[in-house]
Amino acid sequence: MHRYLRGGRIDVQEIAAELGLGRTTVYRWFGSREKLIGQVVARAGEPALRAARAQARGTGGQALLETFDGFNRFLADNRVLRTFVERERDAALRIITSGAGTVHPRMVEMISGLIVAEIEAGNYVAPVEPDTLGYAIVRLGEAFLFNDTAGMRGDVDRLRDVEAAILGVSTPERGREAPR
């Protein structure tokens, strides 16, 4: 994980040597280099999402929007993640966005958990089932932050506007109060 956080290329042979293990053991534990990187990326994202939630003000949809916006800005500004996506684009997109991988399902679980917590606290009424909303929020983030197809990669302001609309949160740009 430290190698990833320093921005270095993740080489299974080097990691195995650092841990005093054989490369085969590392592959047995994780299955593949991509799964190993997925574990590292998911684990690195968890404290960032918790920090974004801790810094968000208010409750309900507004707190969710601020949390997601803070997390998205962390991802967009993260030099190490950007370097990884630029250096290994195809592998990075598979690792980050695959439903069969580690990162995407873990992010959906964490985002859905935040939504459920606001619902259970009586602070938010979700427009759809929380797991569906969590999935949509994560996919939106992936599209706006990592997919260059529409020329909007890294556009966190536009991402915030779309998330606000989906969450039913009023923003100064939208100017009207949406149902919570």
Language model regions located:
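Residues within the helices of the helix-turn-helix
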Residues: 13, 24, 34
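Short, basic, alpha-helical segments at the C-terminal edge of helix-turn-helix-like DNA-binding modules
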Residues: 41-50
